[in-house]
Each structure stands twice: as C-alpha cells, then as structure tokens.
C-alpha cells in the first residue's frame, strides 16, 4: 500500500510540475492587436471595398493561439489581404547574412497558414551581395512569396541590382495577388524634392510600391502625385501602399504633441532603443486608436483621401513588448 501511495504521489507531482512549466499562453496582447487590425480593415473597406490591408511581421496572429502549428484564425486572416515579413531568408541577425534555418522554418510555417487562406506574402530580405540577392529572390519564389531584396535597411534607395528587376512585366496590376515584385521605399531623405522621388519611381517597373504618406519636409503627397506614382515606365500600372506604424508612436509625425516629452499621455510607453524617436504604445487604448483610424482627422483617413490602394501596417509585433 505504501508503494502504491508513493507512486500516486509522484504521478500527481509530475502532472503538477508540467502544469507549472506549460501554462496556457496569455493571448491578451495578441488578441488586442488582432482586434486593432480587424477594426482598421473594417473601417477602411467600409469606405473603399477594394482597399488593401497588409500587416508586417507579427505573423503569430495568423493562428488562434499564436502557435506555428495552431488553428488558422480566419476572422483575422479574412480581414487582411496579405502579410509583410522582414528578414525571412536574409537579415534576421545581421544584414547580408542568411537567417538561421530554425527561425526561417518557424516563420514559413506561419506565413504558409496565411498564404493558404488566400493572402499574398510580401517578403523583404536585407541583403546586398548580388549572389545572395539572387538567392533571396529564388528562395522566396520557390516558397510562393513575392519578395524584395533591400540593399539598404533604411529603405531609402532603389537598388541598382538586379537589372532588369526580378519578374519585370508590363501588366497593369489591380489586385495584390497579381503583383510579381515590389519596391519598399519609405525613407525619402536622399531625394531632393517630391518631383525627384516621383521621377525615380516612375522610371521603374515594379508592380507595387510601399512608401510614406509624407515627404521629408512633412508635407503629404497629393492624390495627383500618388496617381503619377502608379505609372510604370513601360506603360503598365502599379499598386501604391502607404506605410503606417500602429504599434509605435513616432515623434516626427504630425500627431506628435510638443508637451509629450514632459507630460506624455498614459498610453505612451518607453522609447525603442533601436529606433530613437519611436515609442511603444498601448495600441488598444482608444485615444491612440482614434489617432490611427475611425474619424475624418485620422491617419488612415488621410491615406485613403490621398488615393493609396492600401496600407502597410507596421509594428504588428508590438504585442511582444507587453507579453
């Protein structure tokens, strides 16, 4: 009897330890980001049913439990049109260095869940050696992803390699699924004027462009200027998306208040040490969300009025800061 009781006690202890080691994941902050993206999508598509929603990174939101083997979260996946992913094959640890195989495999399992639901995957690899740029394009193509080999992490540059660009074509692109390549150019600092920026982009044949609503002088691109940017050099048309960070506040944006440095709102958190001027936010806070969408003065409404085809949402992985 004593042996039986001892065995029973050990069994209970083992299960108790397992419960402590493997608690159910706290999905609060992931779910709050999902809700934020879904609400942004419903608002935008309510104004323009063809408006395209592409969240970047934070691909764990593709499943209900955030696990790479989890069940697809179709409520979220159906609210978006694609996913952006940085550093998939190159740049995860260092630029121009291959991403570790285990990290690549993990991300691909999640990206494929979104892809298999009908979404388009846009990959940005940070790679500058021509041979590695070729490898990036090939590996992404083999995986069924559309990709851009960025030779500057600041995304302030149109790469001179390869020439012609990967998968160049003269088609008119009206849906994200038609895009065979894209240009990620959100930092206009090297360009002397809007005209200089527009001329540089329209001299290319990329199927899609990700850019900023604002030029470096703080002025917005007009609907007429966005319409110009939709022209490829070869006569085709491209899609144009506006970058918008929803998981961090940026102190150079129009919404930034001068007194926030000494009297910050409750939802404004610590500075991002990797990107000075960027601050973590409680992205579920109604005051922050009101800045982003839902009213005529919001950031997203400005993007819609400028004639962009969609929005490229960044810092989706902002939930990691709070977990």
Explain the meaning of each model-derived region.
Residues 6-8:
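Sec-dependent N-terminal signal peptides
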Residues 21-323:
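Glycan-processing catalytic domains of CAZymes
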């Amino acid at each position: 009897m004593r042996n039986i009781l001892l065995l029973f006690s050990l069994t209970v202890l083992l299960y108790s330890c397992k419960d402590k080691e493997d608690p159910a994941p706290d999905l609060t902050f992931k779910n709050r980001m999902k809700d934020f993206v879904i609400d942004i999508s419903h608002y935008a598509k309510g104004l323009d049913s063809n408006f395209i929603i592409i969240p970047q990174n934070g691909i764990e939101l593709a499943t209900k439990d955030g696990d790479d083997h989890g069940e697809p979260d179709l409520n979220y996946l159906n609210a978006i049109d694609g996913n952006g992913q940085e550093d998939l094959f190159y740049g995860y640890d260092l630029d121009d260095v291959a991403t570790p195989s285990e990290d690549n495999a993990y991300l691909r399992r999640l990206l494929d869940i979104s892809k298999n639901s009908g979404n388009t995957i846009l990959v940005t690899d940070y790679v500058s050696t021509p041979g590695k740029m070729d490898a990036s394009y090939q590996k992404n193509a083999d995986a069924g992803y559309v990709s851009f080999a960025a030779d500057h992490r600041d995304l302030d540059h149109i790469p001179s390699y390869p020439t012609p660009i990967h998968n160049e074509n003269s088609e008119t692109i009206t849906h994200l699924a038609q895009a065979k390549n894209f240009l990620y150019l959100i930092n206009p600092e090297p360009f002397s004027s809007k005209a200089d920026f527009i001329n540089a982009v329209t001299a290319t044949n990329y199927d899609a462009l990700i850019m900023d609503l604002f030029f470096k002088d703080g002025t917005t691109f007009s609907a007429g200027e966005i319409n110009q940017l939709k022209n490829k050099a070869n006569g085709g048309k491209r899609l144009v998306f506006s970058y918008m960070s929803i998981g961090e506040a940026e102190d150079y944006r129009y919404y930034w208040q001068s007194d926030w440095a000494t009297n910050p709102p409750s939802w404004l958190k610590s500075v991002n040490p990797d990107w000075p001027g960027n601050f973590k936010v409680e992205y579920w806070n109604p005051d922050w969300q009101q800045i982003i969408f839902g009213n005529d003065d919001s950031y997203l409404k400005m993007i819609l009025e400028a004639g962009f085809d969609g929005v490229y949402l960044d810092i989706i992985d902002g939930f990691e800061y709070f977990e």
